[in-house]
Amino acid sequence: MAGKRSGWSRAALLQLLLGVNLVVMPPTRARSLRFVTLLYRHGDRSPVKTYPKDPYQEEEWPQGFGQLTKEGMLQHWELGQALRQRYHGFLNTSYHRQEVYVRSTDFDRTLMSAEANLAGLFPPNGMQRFNPNISWQPIPVHTVPITEDRLLKFPLGPCPRYEQLQNETRQTPEYQNESSRNAQFLDMVANETGLTDLTLETVWNVYDTLFCEQTHGLRLPPWASPQTMQRLSRLKDFSFRFLFGIYQQAEKARLQGGVLLAQIRKNLTLMATTSQLPKLLVYSAHDTTLVALQMALDVYNGEQAPYASCHIFELYQEDSGNFSVEMYFRNESDKAPWPLSLPGCPHRCPLQDFLRLTEPVVPKDWQQECQLASGPADTEVIVALAVCGSILFLLIVLLLTVLFRMQAQPPGYRHVADGEDHA
């Protein structure tokens, strides 16, 4: 009986201690999403240019070259709907200007893509409907002139050091081998298109034009066979790698994609410490923007970013109170975004590790790093000019000294001429 009473006492004591712990210890904080940054490419567009022998010139396209099509508008509306579903419970179901900020490059296609995306993300509810027959509301999209854009329009320039790196890239074995392997092919394409200055770096324009025409049901010329299109596509992907990789990728990143990455890092840090930014920050830009950023992050898959593809940064606060970053890439509309892992970090990357690992590709002073370093020849010229300048300076000082002494010397004795008046 005593043993039974002792067992009950121990059980009661255990329950009491558990109750005290529940009262004294704070509840565990659940992991929560705090901030999202999106970078997406515009939707389907018309070609940005054509070639001399192309039977389809600019008048073939309703709005001309480089413009968003109806297909492109739909792609971004659907992306907006997908984002609305993904961030249900994080974003308000209706648009609140304090929650969202959108910036675009100053191109019609990126501005219109952002607007179509926002139409899918924030359809008007209740009082936001200014017309019962229109399920749309205006939401601001911010931009700066193309010539002033140092954040989203790539490649960034003018940057002499970047141009020097590109010249050095052209001398690498990989570039030289690619050039020699495709010399005859490029000659054939140049002859068929009427282009006279076709290179590894410009042939992407031909592929882009043919791809847009094929996508919109226009008949391609006989020379643009499936094999030719496949080869052009591969060279198009090579041109992206030429812009941001192949040679000195880390330094190129500091001069290109690292500039945008620096802003993203700054925003992540700010939201982890002060929460002073909107919950959703959106950049509407181009395939070159995505490739530049992903090359800086070293997560580029080697292929052109498709229309309406979207790179996602999500900042989480863990139950420990620390912050982590997760990245995703949505490049297929019928599939969930692909998880991306920064090299050297798990997919759920602690914020401090994310900042540490990306630090080497972020410029300290972009303007300064874009300047050309003085080479040996430049140093010799500078030294020679300095020596010549010093000699010239000494000669001038010597000459002035002699002249000063001559003027300061008192006049000597002389005979007075006959008939000369005395003072």
Curated annotation (Swiss-Prot):
It is an enzyme of class 3 (hydrolase). GO terms for cellular component: extracellular exosome; lysosomal lumen; lysosomal membrane; lysosome; membrane. GO terms for molecular function: acid phosphatase activity. It is found in: Lysosome membrane; Lysosome lumen. It catalyses: a phosphate monoester + H2O = an alcohol + phosphate. The keyword Metal-binding does not apply. Its EC number is 3.1.3.2. The chain crosses the membrane at residues 381-401. One of its GO terms (biological process) is skeletal system development. Residues 1-30 form the signal peptide. Coiled coil: none annotated. Residues 402-423 are cytoplasmic. Pfam families: His_Phos_2 (PF00328). Residues 31-380 are lumenal. The active site is at residues 42, 287. Glycans are attached at residues 92, 133, 167, 177, 191, 267, 322, 331. It comes from the Eukaryota. The membrane-bound form is converted to the soluble form by sequential proteolytic processing. First, the C-terminal cytoplasmic tail is removed. Cleavage by a lysosomal protease releases the soluble form in the lysosome lumen. N-glycosylated. The intermediates formed during enzymatic deglycosylation suggest that all eight predicted N-glycosylation sites are used. It is a single-pass membrane protein. It is linked to Lysosomal acid phosphatase has been shown to be deficient in cultured fibroblasts from patients manifesting intermittent vomiting, hypotonia, lethargy, opisthotonos, terminal bleeding and death in early infancy. This is Lysosomal acid phosphatase. It comes from Homo sapiens (Human). The lineage of its organism: Eukaryota, Metazoa, Chordata, Craniata, Vertebrata. The gene is ACP2.
